[in-house]
Amino acid sequence: MNMKLKTLFAAAFAVVGFCSTASAVTYPLPTDGSRLVGQNQVITIPEGNTQPLEYFAAEYQMGLSNMMEANPGVDTFLPKGGTVLNIPQQLILPDTVHEGIVINSAEMRLYYYPKGTNTVIVLPIGIGQLGKDTPINWTTKVERKKAGPTWTPTAKMHAEYRAAGEPLPAVVPAGPDNPMGLYALYIGRLYAIHGTNANFGIGLRVSHGCVRLRNEDIKFLFEKVPVGTRVQFIDEPVKATTEPDGSRYIEVHNPLSTTEAQFEGQEIVPITLTKSVQTVTGQPDVDQVVLDEAIKNRSGMPVRLN
C-alpha cells in the first residue's frame, strides 16, 4: 500500500457488458470460454466538486483502491473539477471455478456466481489490516446468516482499543453503530462477510480480518446468498487470459503488502507471475514492452498484450 493510501485511511472517517441491479453490478458470463467481461468508463469530475474520491467510487460500485490504481495521482480527498477519471469496470474473471462466492483479496473484489443464472455479481470489499490479514487459499462455506449481528471483541481487540483510549463493551449490540453493520454472513474460523458503520474503508485494509462491504451490498448478499454457499478466498494480483479470438490480456493489481515498509510505500511490493499467467505472457506474439509497462503501472485494468 502506498503512502497516499495509508494517509487516506488514517484521515478517513448503457455500459456494454453489464448492468446495475439495485446496488450490484451484474455481468453476463461469456459462453465461449472468455474470461474478459465488462467495459471501462470515463467520467469527468464536475466543476466546483466538493466530494472525495470515495463518493465517485461508491457511485460506480468501485473500491477506493481500484479507483486509485486506475487513476494514479488523483487527489483522493477532493478531486478537482475537470479531472478525467477512469472507472475500471472491465475485468478478467479469476482463474478458478465459477461457483458460489470467490473473494480475491489482492484486487479487493468479491465475485458471486448465483446458481443457474450464468451471471457474476462483482462487489468491492475492505479486508484485514497488515498483521490482521484476511485469509487466502481457503475454501469454506456460508455457515449461517444474521440480520442485526452483535460484535464480541477478542481479548486482543479489547487491549488494542483500550490502548487507543476507546474501551469496548464485552458485546457491542446490534444497530447502526456496530462495526459489523446490519447484516453478516458467517463463514467459519471466527470470520464473517459483513457490513460497516463507517462511510469509508471499501477498497482499503481496515478490518480485523473479516470481509467488509458497503451496507447496500451486504444487504443484497444477505437476501440472495443461501446458507451452504461455497466461499473461496484467493490472492491473485495478476490475472491473464487468452481470449477465443486469440487476443491476450493481463490485469495487474498491486499485491498486498507483507511488511510495514511496503505498507508505508517505502518499498515496492514485488510481483511474481504464476505459471498460469506465464502461459499467456510467454507466447511469442506478446509485446514485451507493453507487458513490462502493464506490470510497472499496475493499473488494475486489463491491457491487451498482442
UniProtKB/Swiss-Prot annotation:
Where does the record place the L,D-TPase catalytic domain? 99-234
Q: Which GO terms describe its molecular function?
A: glycosyltransferase activity; peptidoglycan L,D-transpeptidase activity
Coiled-coil regions, chain positions:
none
Task: Kindly report, in one word, the top-level EC class recorded for this enzyme.
Answer: transferase
EC number(s) per UniProt? 2.-.-.-
What Gene Ontology biological process does one annotation of this record name?
regulation of cell shape
Q: Which first-to-last residue range defines the signal peptide? A: 1-24
- Cystine bridges: none
In terms of superkingdom, the source organism counts as Bacteria
Keywords (alphabetical) are:
Cell shape, Cell wall biogenesis/degradation, Glycosyltransferase, Hydrolase, Peptidoglycan synthesis, Periplasm, Signal, Transferase
Pathway it belongs to? Cell wall biogenesis; peptidoglycan biosynthesis
Catalytic residues (UniProt): 194, 210
According to its UniProt entry, the function of this protein is described as: Responsible, at least in part, for anchoring of the major outer membrane lipoprotein (Lpp, also known as the Braun lipoprotein) to the peptidoglycan via a meso-diaminopimelyl-L-Lys- bond on the terminal residue of Lpp. Can be oxidized in vivo, its reduction depends preferentially on DsbG, although DsbC is able to partially replace DsbG.
Q: Which family does it belong to?
A: Belongs to the YkuD family.
What is annotated about its quaternary structure and interactions? Interacts with DsbG.
What is this protein's record name?
Answer: Probable L,D-transpeptidase YbiS
Species of origin: Escherichia coli (strain K12)
Q: Identify the taxonomic lineage of the organism of origin.
A: Bacteria, Pseudomonadati, Pseudomonadota, Gammaproteobacteria, Enterobacterales
- The gene that this protein is the product of is ybiS
